[in-house]
Amino acid sequence: MGSACLVDVYGTLLSSQWEVHDRVLPELAGVDQRTWLDAYYRIEPASGVGQVTRAELYELVLRTCGVKPREELVRELVAMHLELLLANARLFEDSLPFLEELRSRGTAIAIVSNCGEHTRALITSLGIVALADVVVLSCEVGLIKPSPRIFRHTLSELRVGAADAVFVDDQAAFCAGAEAVGVRGVQIVRDGALPPGAVRSLLDILG
């Protein structure tokens, strides 16, 4: 473990039930699920880098689906998204012990996530923000994993060198992005086959 640890959110620190969003939101909008999902996942990346707000995202999705984006409906969709996000996210049992142990060792902690605008509220409510030195969210900084730029930005915020940092993520491609700038990447795979060098638990990284 280096002097700094960069940690992903979704799939690493917490689980989320995106399939619930994929079912409930199109029902609320009165749109066929397949039509909604095709439009949503084509447009959603713009939200992940802060180019559109969640409300603007739903306006665009509704228009693409041939539905008039009534202001009331858009508000309902945004509210439902946040409600589902907060209700269905669950910290993995090793997440807070891992972050707390890092703090006790004096290891700087950065949260690095590809996400939309409501993630900060979520991770604040779960106690993650209080344990972090730096929080880098793609929607706020306009940078996204696996681009090396988001890792360089995070290292700059932490004021540490790449060789002194470790990055933990459930996506192998994102770990490779960190390694491209000299940060050691560790993939966490909680279920299924364990690739070489990957870990099953965050606590395995502590040594």
Language-model regions, residue ranges each:
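Asp-based, Mg2+/Mn2+-dependent phosphohydrolase catalytic module
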Residues: 1-7, 96, 100-101, 107, ...
